[in-house]
Amino acid sequence: MLLTPTELERLTLYTAAELSRKRRSKGLRLNFPEASALIADEILEGAREGRSVAELIGFGSTILNTDDVMPGVADLLPVLQVEGTFPDGTKLVTVHQPIRPGQLPLAVMPTPGEILAPDGDIHLNGDRPTATLRAINTGDRPVQIGSHYHFFEVNKALDFPRERAFGMHLDIPAGTAVRFEPGELREVQLVQFGGTGDIHGFSGLTNGNLHDPACKLAALERARAQFFKGA
């Protein structure tokens, strides 16, 4: 038996659809691949029987409803498209909202990707020590500082009391930044790093634990030796 790639795909779809019918007959709710395969197979069979495209577009939304599928499947399948062979040629059948509401209330079904958050506001780093200080960019180029950069080790042209910033980063949402234009003075809010307190990299001033007094003294000495303003 010689089969074209399209015919092989049709057999694969039929196999998936038969599995869907078997599971549906057991009372199981269908997942996304099962629901898609079943609807597509019914449409292709309708085309083989000689039904029109317009008829199959309407028929495609009557095969399954939300009672037949797992929660969220209907939201994942807003449109179903399948190419079928009709008596007058190959045509694309597009069914919008192929899975219509069933008898069960939709309110009990969660939306895919929905965030179920507790009541109240979210407080960033609410349980960590903070500090507020003023910093000025004494350089001739802009300085941009990311949310989790060790503020003690930022650009040496930024002038502020660096000792107060040891072990701290900007108290802003992760992934955001604060930009200092040349000569700009800004007040910033800092918050202490969490976790174990080990700080490595950045400008190479710390490379130790922020809770270690000896590490802090050594970092200050390196900052002064390398002419970091405010150290």
Curated annotation (Swiss-Prot):
A GO BP annotation: urea catabolic process
InterPro entries in the cross-refs: Urease_beta-like, Urease_betasu_sf, Urease_gamma-beta_su, Urease_gamma/gamma-beta_su, Urease_gamma_sf, Urease_subunit
Residue span of region Urease gamma: 1-101
Keyword annotations: Cytoplasm, Hydrolase
Source species, domain of life: Bacteria
Main location group: cytoplasm
Its EC number(s): 3.5.1.5
Pfam families on file: Urease_beta, Urease_gamma
Ranges for region Urease beta: 102-231
CDD domains listed in its UniProt record: Urease_beta, Urease_gamma
Pathway: Nitrogen metabolism; urea degradation; CO(2) and NH(3) from urea (urease route): step 1/1
SUPFAM superfamilies hit by this protein: Urease, beta-subunit, Urease, gamma-subunit
GO MF annotation terms: nickel cation binding; urease activity
Annotated GO CC locations: urease complex
Subcellular location: Cytoplasm
Catalytic activity: urea + 2 H2O + H(+) = hydrogencarbonate + 2 NH4(+)
Xref: PANTHER family: UREASE
NCBIfam families reported in the protein's UniProt record: PRK13192.1 (NF009671), PRK13203.1 (NF009682), PRK13241.1 (NF009712), urease_beta (TIGR00192), urease_gam (TIGR00193)
Subunit structure: Heterohexamer of 3 UreC (alpha) and 3 UreAB (gamma/beta) subunits.
Family stated for the protein in its record: In the N-terminal section; belongs to the urease gamma subunit family. In the C-terminal section; belongs to the urease beta subunit family.
Name recorded for this polypeptide: Urease subunit gamma/beta
Lineage, opening ranks: Bacteria, Pseudomonadati, Pseudomonadota, Gammaproteobacteria, Pseudomonadales
